[in-house]
């Protein structure tokens, strides 16, 4: 199984340096990862370095809390695309989801989808570790209804990461036609394969080299 082609090679820590970003980019090019996932500050740098490569530039929106206003998320999306982003991973408005304010949650996603329309894929991070099963299902349904391309488990900055049972639930909820991204705490090839077998079509990891280096 060629896992590399579905990995978003990720560096989102606040203390990430330019040297680390350049290393990330080189590793992504050498191993044909799906994308590099970097904070918005680094999108232009990554886009320039990857212009002759099949590796996409992915960034994060409303990250890591999802508590920005919709207008802020829209601006972040537009700015990221202007700087060269081809995929955006937005964080759902978790508090509004828990308050059952589904219209707000759907509109929040929909506006980012509109801002990205035809220019970038949109992945919606639902932060599974903070949600009940009912909330996970509702979040996935709202993301699909709003026109997002993927649902994604985690930011990697909360209380937990990707679990196979969550991926199974997300896949069952969105059906076969939508992407499901597993991220957060994935360190080994074995873990990645379990998540793929559960229904993940993309893996987000900072330990990508370790994952693909294992037999």
UniProtKB/Swiss-Prot annotation:
CDD domains: DeoC. It holds the Pfam family DeoC. It comes from the Bacteria. It catalyses: 2-deoxy-D-ribose 5-phosphate = D-glyceraldehyde 3-phosphate + acetaldehyde. One of its GO terms (biological process) is deoxyribonucleotide catabolic process. Belongs to the DeoC/FbaB aldolase family. DeoC type 1 subfamily. This is Deoxyribose-phosphate aldolase. The lineage of its organism: Bacteria, Bacillati, Bacillota, Clostridia, Eubacteriales.
């Amino acid at each position: 199984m060629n896992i590399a082609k579905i990995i978003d090679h990720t560096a989102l820590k606040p203390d990430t340096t330019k040297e680390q970003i350049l290393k990330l980019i080189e590793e992504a090019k050498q191993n044909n990862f799906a994308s590099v996932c970097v904070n918005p500050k680094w999108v232009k740098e990554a886009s320039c370095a990857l212009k002759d490569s099949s590796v996409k530039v992915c960034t994060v929106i409303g990250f890591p809390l999802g508590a920005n206003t919709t207008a802020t998320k829209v601006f972040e999306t537009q700015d990221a695309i202007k700087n060269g982003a081809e995929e955006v991973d937005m964080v759902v408005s978790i508090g509004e989801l828990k308050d059952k304010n589904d219209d707000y949650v759907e509109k929040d996603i929909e506006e980012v989808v509109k801002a990205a329309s035809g220019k970038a894929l949109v992945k919606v991070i639902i932060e599974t570790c903070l949600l009940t099963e009912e909330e996970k299902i509702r979040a996935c349904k709202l993301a699909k209804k709003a026109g997002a391309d993927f649902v994604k488990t985690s930011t990697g900055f909360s209380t937990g990461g990707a679990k196979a049972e969550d991926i199974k639930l997300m896949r069952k909820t969105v059906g076969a036609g939508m992407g499901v991204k597993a991220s957060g705490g994935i360190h080994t090839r074995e873990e990645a394969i379990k998540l793929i077998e559960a229904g993940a079509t993309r893996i987000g990891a900072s330990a990508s080299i370790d994952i693909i280096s294992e037999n």
